[in-house]
Amino acid sequence: MEEKQPIINAVPAGIDGCGHYRIIQPALIMQQLGADLTLSPAAHFRTFGQNITWTQRMCNTSLLERMVKYKETTKQRFVVDFDDLLWLYEGESLPDYNLCRAKVNSEENTAGMAKYLDKLADKVTVSTDELKKSLLQFVDESKITVIPNMLAYKEWYHAQSPRPKKDIFYFAGSYTHYDNVNKKLGDFSQNLVHFLGNKKVVVKSLCPYFIKPEINYKASRLTTYANDFWKETRNVDFIIAPLANNVFNKCKSDLKYLESAAVGRVCLVSDFPGSPYSGAHPYQKIPEGTTTTGLKYIVERANEHYDEILKYQYEYLNKRWLDNNIGLYSEVLK
């Protein structure tokens, strides 16, 4: 009789250290060799007896409906987190250039949030004050806590490196923030394209196809891990984190500014009323509508004051280490 192949659920205690070497790596190789194996972040038995579910971006109507029924059955408390605007707020949601617009139906999400979110969420956490304001149409203010994005010190303490002074730029805008099919630049303004035309540029993820001939660019292979961001940016002088002036971007956080501070690079940021980068140093701000000549002046000035801006950025970051602020999460998850 043929021996039946076992079905394995591999559950490491953590993603680094012994968990990495004794469970994760052996499991990945066993998968490659044909084992019926799932590498899981949590075994099902660990959920027995839990009384809080902590989850993110619950805005899909059918999912919200099922989760409300699940909550009624299990009597659990739900803590729900949001870090982006995925519903209608002040008549807007995802801008027309955003790649995710097709799969995020704002009207449907808004209807689902209005019907189910207050029933589901005992507490809601958000990354910005503006995002909190947008949720007041669905949830009582007493349920909402603003916890800004932060960096874990153990992932970033090693990331500083001397700048190369090669006049190389790293474009850190999301690849979802422009529309290749309809040639909409979104956060990547035409003036910025003209300015970068004779510069060396590393572009995070994907470069808009229709401007490739206009800039001297190298594709980034960045993942979300801190180590990769450090590697990708160690040979650049400036990180550019552009945002168009719209409701969606006003709800976003200053995470790219924190990451730039951690790797020791000056971050050039968009400046408009309600910009998430309002707390940046004045010499690194790019006002809305800045011309190509204006961009040249801003970069020259930032070069002259590079160390001053770096110091400012790091002082800003020092208030936002996750290790020193973990109590914000502990308080919400009581």
Question: Can you name each region flagged by the protein language model?
Answer:
Residues D122-L136, D140-Y157:
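Donor nucleotide-sugar binding/catalytic pocket of nucleotide-sugar-dependent glycosyltransferases
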Residues M1-N60, S93:
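N-terminal pre-catalytic "stem/leader" segment of glycosyltransferase-like enzymes
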Residues N9, A13-Q25, N149-R234, Y257:
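Conserved catalytic-core segment of nucleotide-activated headgroup transferases in glycan assembly
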Residues G14-D16, V80-A111, S174-Y175, F272:
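Acceptor-binding helix/loop patch of EC 2.4 sugar-transfer enzymes
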Residues K69, T73, R101-V124:
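Membrane-proximal helix-turn-helix segments that form the acceptor-binding/catalytic region
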Residues Y178-L185, A226-N227, K231-E232, D237-A262, ...:
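Nucleotide-sugar-dependent
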Residues T293, E300-K334:
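A charged, aromatic-enriched C-terminal amphipathic alpha-helix characteristic of glycosyltransferases
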